[in-house]
């Protein structure tokens, strides 16, 4: 039985993950963590998730929950995820990170922790989205420089980072497939008199409103035709399912940074 600690256990994603982990054969919730001062501290993680008690009380310090754990699932913030990665590295516990908004410095700190333990770092745990990453890669390679690439994403009004980590990753995938440096190619939310669109540019536009779980469309705009690849998330459950799948796959892997393509076998695994 793989023992799983869930951070952010009282949040929207955390409660979904607790429910999915307890329903997944071979996985068990062994720990639950929330921020200091949360009203969830001391409460049962199973009850908070809307189910029967698990006998797992929510604590305010990840280190307290790591004893005997095999893997941590972390959907919090990139700042908290860095601290959690460092705690997991110190304890020798694998880590699945679904947080977004990572800065280069934060990613470097996660990579440093991954020198000691295996880490899955993915901006989107959905199986469907990770298939879309591969479809975009293939489309960019086949269509080439004759098609302009644009990305539009929309999420609920409570999402704090923009653009989404998934939109950025879609842009990176397209840029890499076209032989462009993502740092140079990606352009965000245009405004003003900018002149003609540079042919090497990949635009990313952000929308926020309502209760939209998540939608991403990649446009390949050519002369006389347009190809669109779209993914629509209608429930957070599919993110939790992907995270549970990653948690079952990761323990026992060599230290290093993995992503969902590795988990799903979409390319040669590490």
From Swiss-Prot:
Gene Ontology cellular component list: cytosol
Keywords in alphabetical order: Amino-acid biosynthesis, Cytoplasm, Diaminopimelate biosynthesis, Lysine biosynthesis, NAD, NADP, Oxidoreductase
Presence of the UniProt keyword Nucleus in the record: no
UniProt xrefs under InterPro entries: DapB_C, DapB_N, DapB_N_CS, DHDPR_bac, NAD(P)-bd_dom_sf
Record has Amino-acid biosynthesis as a keyword: yes
Primary localization class, coarse: cytoplasm
UniProt EC number: 1.17.1.8
Gene3D superfamilies named among the record's database cross-references: Dihydrodipicolinate Reductase, domain 2 (3.30.360.10), NAD(P)-binding Rossmann-like Domain (3.40.50.720)
Pathway: Amino-acid biosynthesis; L-lysine biosynthesis via DAP pathway; (S)-tetrahydrodipicolinate from L-aspartate: step 4/4
Subcellular location: Cytoplasm
Family: Belongs to the DapB family.
Protein name: 4-hydroxy-tetrahydrodipicolinate reductase
Biological process annotations from GO: diaminopimelate biosynthetic process; lysine biosynthetic process via diaminopimelate
Binding site for NAD(+): 8-13, 34, 98-100, 122-125
Protein's gene: dapB
Active site: 155 (proton donor/acceptor), 159 (proton donor)
Matching Pfam families: DapB_C, DapB_N
Domain of life, source organism: Bacteria
